[in-house]
Every structure is written in C-alpha cells, then in structure tokens.
Amino acid sequence: MKTAQIRQKFLDYFESKGHIIESSASLIPHNDKTLLFVNAGMVPFKDVFSGIEKRPYTRAVSVQRCARAGGKHNDLENVGYTARHHTFFEMLGNFSFGDYFKREAIHYAWEFLTKELNLPKKNLWVSVFDQDNEAEDIWVNEIGFPKNRISRCGAKDNFWQMGDTGPCGPSSEIFYDHGEHIAGGPPGHANEDGDRYIEIWNLVFTEFDKQEDGYLKPLAVPCVDTGMGLERLVAVLQHKNNNYDTDGFQNLVKAVVNLTPKFNNIKDNNASVRVITDHIRSAAFMIVDGVIPSNEGRGYVLRRIIRRGIRHGHKMGIGKVFFYRLASILALEFKDVYPELEQALSKVEKVLKREEQRFSKTLDQGMSILEEVITNFKGSEINGKIVFKLYDTYGFPVDLTSDIARERNLTIDMSGFEVEMTKQRDRARQASDFKISEKGVDIAERTEFLGYKQLKNVSLIQAIINNNELVEKIEVGDHGIVVLAQSSFYAESGGQIGDKGILSNMQVEFRVDHTNKQKSGAFEHHGVLNKGVLKVSDAVQANVDKKSRKCIARNHSATHLLHAALHIVLGKAVMQKGSLVGSEKLRFDFSYDKVIVKSDLERIESIVNRKILGNTKVYTDITNIEGAKKKGAMTLFGKKYGDTVRVLTMGKNEFSVELCGGTHVNQLGDIGLFRIISESSVSAGVRRIEALTGYDAYQFDNRIQNSLNKIAQMTRSSNTEVVGKVTQLIKQQKELEKQIATFQKKIANNQGDDLIVQAQEVKGIKLLSTVVEGVTSKDLRNIVDKLKDKLSSAVIVLAVVINDKVSLVTGVTKDLTKQYQARKILNHVAKQIGGKGDGRSDMAQGGGTKPECLIKALASVKSLI
C-alpha cells in the first residue's frame, strides 16, 4: 500500500465515523507564542480543547504537516543517525471535542489498524498511564487484548502535554513489534530504546488544562486527541525498518545519491543522504508557510536546517550549489496533497539558492579552522571558547560544530560555550532595556461592537480594572480600564489601532486613550477619569473621536489598495507579514526578497491613487469562508476564521477583495491622496512600506515643495532647473575629490621613499617600525606594499593616527614569512594600543584606540626580531 493510499484511507475511515475532514494548517501556529512550529496534529485545535474557540462540529480528522526542529520538541540532532526521526513529518489524527472519549477512541484505533490496514494483532503492543485503570479495562475486557502485552508506564511516557501549559491528559500508545530478529524490548522495559517495538499511534485523553503554576484544571468537557506519524505507519505497512526506504522518500533519496560524484560510492542508507532528504522537506514547507532564513526565531531554525543539509552535501563531495534543486522533486511528490508547494516553487528555490550561496564562504572558513583544531586535538571534548569563536567570529553554527565533532567521536564543551554566550548577552544587555508586561484581569463577558454603523452609543459598564484588579469604582485622576456591554469603539486587532474618545454622562467623564480586546472578546477602554466618580453598572455614552476614526479608516482602506497594487507590480507570491494602521500613517510588511526599484514604487503609488480618484463605493459582505474564497478574497495562510467572515471589496472589477474586521471609508475618494514615504528591509525576505494619506500626505508633499524651493534659492536656479544645477555641483565635487586623492597619493609615494632611510638593520634584517602622517589607512597599505618591493628581507610596521584612532599595517617580505608572521607582529602591537587585527603571513591590518601607547608599542617590535 502506497503512502498516498494510506493517507486517504485514514481520512475516509474517520469521515465514515462522522468526523469532519480539516485541511492541514500552516506550520506557523496561529495566535500562539508558546510554539515555534506546529509540532502535533492537535495544535490547530488548541483553543477548541481549552474552550476558548467553538467549531460547528464535535468530531474532526486531519493530516497535519508538522515540524520538530526547535523548542521543547526538537528532533533535529537525531535526524540522519536514526531510521525514524524527522524534522518534517505528517501526523494523522482524529479528535473529539466533548463528543466521544476513551472507549470510542480505543475501539476506532483498533478497528482501523486491524481491519482497515490488516495489521497482525499478534504484532501489536499497548501502553497505558499507570493510574489509568479505565483505559486498561477497555483494552482487556472490551477489545480482548492480552494483559501480558500491556505496559503500565509513568507520566514521563504516558501523560501527554503539548507545552509547559495548556491541554494535557493520560495517553495510551500502540506499538508495532518488528520481531525477535531486531534488538529492543517493549515499552516500560529496560531495553525499550531498541528498534524492535515502534510506537505508531498515541491516543491522548485530554482531561486537563495545565496552568502556569502547575495546577491541572479539569476541562469542562473531556476530549480526545490522537496522533499517528504517517511515515512510521507506512514503514510498518511496507515492511521496512527504515522510514527512508518507503515510497514517499525514495525519489528524493535517489536524487540526492545521483548528485554525488560517482567515485564516492554513496549508498542509499548513508546518514548524510537521510539528513538532506529530510531537511529539504522541512525547509521547503517552512518557506511555503512564510518563514525566511534569519538569525532569530523560526528564521534561525530554518537557517540551521538549510545549512545542516548543505554541510552534509559538501561532506559527500557535492561541490556545487545543489540543495535548491531538490525542491522541484519534492513539489512533484506532494502536488496532489499540498499543491501550494508547487505554486510557490519559484520562491522556495530562490530562497534556498540564495542561502546556500551565502553559506558557502562561511562553511569553507569554519571547516578549515575546525579541521585544524581537530587535527591537532588530543582530548575528547572541544573547548567551548573555540566553539564560541567559530560561532561568533565566523558565523559557524554550533549544531554543525557538534555534528562534525560527533562524527569524529568527539563532544563539544557546551557549558564553556554557554559561559561565553552569557558574557556576550551581558554585554548586549547593557545597551537594552525591556520590561515584561504583567498579566491583566480576564473578563468573561464579550463586548458587542456597534462601531461599523455609528460612532456613539449608550451602554452599561460591565467591569472596571484599576492597578490590575477588579474594582467597583474609580475617582478623578485614576487611571483605569473600563469594559462596556456594547461599544462603538474599535478594539485594536488585525493591525488596526484601537479608537480613542470619551465615555460620559451628566456626572462623569472618562477619557479613552486607546481600546484593546481580550481573548474572550471583552473590549478594554484604557484611559483616565477627568470628572466625577465612575462605578460598575453606570450607564455612559461612548463617543468615538470622529477625526481620529476617519484618519484610521483612510489608512486602512489605503492598506488594502496597496496590498492589491503590490500583487499587480511584484507578483502574486507577495504575502502579508504584518501591518500597523494608525491615525497618522500606515505600515505594511510583506514577503519580497529584494529591494523594490524606484520605478516599481512609483507604479504602485500611481495605481493606488488612480483607484482613489475613481471614487468607487466600498462594499461589505458577511458570508462564510468558502463563500469568501469563491469571491477571490485574499486570506492569510494559516489564520483561523470563524463561521462568518466580513469581506471588503474595493475598486472597479473587484480590484481588492479581502477578509477584514476593521473600519474603512465609504467611498475610495474619501482617502484623498496616497503617498509612499519609505521602503525598507525588516528582515531577510521581508520588506516594509510606510505611507501617508489625506491631509497628512498633502502636508508631506508641501514640506518637499518647500525644501525644493529652498534648494532652488541656494543654487540660484528655478524649480525646474534645480536638478540640473545640483547634478553639476556634484560633478564638480567629484572632480575636486579626485584631485585631492591624486595629491594624497603623491604625498604617500614621497613618504614611502623618505621612510626607506629610516629602516634599521637588526640581526641582518631590515626593520621599519614608525608613524607616518598625512595619509589614509588605504594609503598606509599601499606604502607597505611598495616598501616590501624596495626593501629586501624586511619587517615593516607602519601606523597613522586619525581622529584619535590608530590604523596599523604590518608587512613581511616573502623570504621571511616562515620566520616572522605579519599577523602575529600586528597583534603584538595592537594589544598594546587597545585593539586587534588580522591578515595573512605577509600582510596584516588592524587598529587601536590608545594612540598615547603607540610609540612604545612600535619600539617593542624590535624585541621580536
């Protein structure tokens, strides 16, 4: 049975049992800061298990893309060295949200394995939580499973939790016994770590929600969460002891082997082949879901995965850029299941290729230094300072150092490395200051939002929060948070800032500075009481600041037009990565891997302004997610949407169609004017555009016009002539700079000739160690080069002081480089003047910050000869 058939059979079976099929969510968890990646099938349902979110069904089944390469669940280090570990895998799962529980879950699992897949019953083994008598009773008395093939295990093995907090509960695991010819014992036994008994399905009976203090809070309704790794199941059904030998991996495995030089005689089961095969899967899908290689968070995990794969390719002798070539084979493998990979293939290949090209130099440098260390190394553990230097100076990842050391039967001194990292963090921390916000008071009541159609309303006060506590009242001057039953104030969400305004009645006035929304849907009106005493259950009139709301609406509608214009000019692959819609300006972050040229920015701006001049009506439609997709609405991949969604349509021929809960203009002409004020890079592969609208855009243009008038006045030209005049001045300046450079070069050449006579002979070697004046650092290097040509058997150390900083250059003629290293001589001098440097054996360059120590330091060179 092929992988595709097994995947579909699982979905079909549970659909026949009343489960709704859910598509795989993005690898990036939605609205969950506790996880780097979706690492289990239940993650997209986390809020459902916790009772925060409700779905229109109580049974679900899915095949979820998962990644375990960072955070608590991290299999990265094991990939390649075992037959079963992966950084990317698919998890089959069936879920019950307060519907069925242990009995049905166990019966379904047993029926699917033994009847649908025809697995031999004699090859199955089961484990249960040692305190879960109910589960064991179902297995023994209802299923008829032999008690002597049931292991009772502790919380470490059979009490599952996704993170430090959140849904959790006892579990029952099903194992497959590969037979006596393979080493290893059953779960719970001393030799359980062998490959004979392989876990294939984990049934989690979610009864609790673990709190931050460790308390196991019972869930309102018990749930079921099961997970079965597709790759492991396929290996069992295809009678393979190695996941990489199954049909789902073989095309990639063969492609990797074919990339290696024939004389290397690489086998299919080579550890490096497994690493590359696995890592291209996780890297490609991470990029599809919007992750870009960087030095932090998810981007750093992706970078580690890509670079680890590349390193193993180099180890096998693949000398060319190769990793990105595998993406097309992967896309073909998954085209029927995950067509989004094929659609984004060009982007995936581009990101992978660029990262490999960037890493090649780092890999060569780091490997050279590490090989030198290992060759001369006599112990069993590489010093942490060396590991840190490779990481900090050359950008060589610690996990690669560890990987290479492991291959040579060495370990790395991680504690020593962490000491060096701590020192670095302490240095960095001195330049930063950050605070951790305290957890606020949770309000269960949901606020009804009225602000789409009105800017004021009357409502009762549901709650008042002061100093992080619920209070009955606040008085004049008190800062507080007011929660209303109904509100016209928009609460910050979807990138749009919250409204400001006034809550008042005859006796009180509360100034609202901003409005937030709790997870429950309660609106928090933050501000200060200007008049009277405000009490819970008081009736107040909520008045939104009309001017601020109009500015925000202009900017939000302009953001939608900008998004659509980006798709036209830069292509459909552009994905929204974040936005901030305020009253003064808008900011839009999006995926794009190069600087946007000026002509494209002008075209984007022009498209938006033409739509504004068209002054078409903005249409709002309430529908379900499927209806929205039929309209062509842009959705954020991986984001969860409710039963009903709000669709905003702008411009002729549905120019922009997006799902949005924000506030907008009624006519596009209300935006007035759109002006891009900046375009920049936020991180690798993510660009940012900032723009102004309306009167703010007009004022921006006015300031530019005033500046142009001043420049015209200073250059004694008209506004239409000013560009030509400034161009002429710049040309003149460059000519003058060339003349200055020519004069400086002549001075430097003359200094070189003058310096020859200062060379002194020490033990048959000419030594020149002195300070020169009136030259640049670049000139200094040229002077040393010429002196090396004119002086035979010479050691030269020259320094220049510019703005209280010392520049140093050392040179050694080639006949002396075996006796004297320019790099070592430079560091000898640099240390004495508070600096450092680097270079080759015949030429090195550096500097320092203590010019007062320079003369003494230069004199000390003589002692080295």
Curated annotation (Swiss-Prot):
It holds the Pfam family tRNA-synt_2c. It catalyses: tRNA(Ala) + L-alanine + ATP = L-alanyl-tRNA(Ala) + AMP + diphosphate. Its main location: cytoplasm. Binds 1 zinc ion per subunit. InterPro entries: aa-tRNA-synth_II/BPL/LPL (IPR045864), Ala-tRNA-lgiase_IIc (IPR002318), Ala-tRNA-ligase_IIc_anticod-bd (IPR018162), Ala-tRNA-synth_IIc_core (IPR018165), Ala-tRNA-synth_IIc_N (IPR018164), Ala-tRNA_ligase (IPR050058), Ala_tRNA_ligase_euk/bac (IPR023033), DHHA1_dom (IPR003156). Zn(2+) binds at residues 556, 560, 660, 664. It is found in: Cytoplasm. PROSITE patterns: AA_TRNA_LIGASE_II_ALA. GO terms for cellular component: cytosol. The keyword Phosphoprotein does not apply. Belongs to the class-II aminoacyl-tRNA synthetase family. This is Alanine--tRNA ligase.
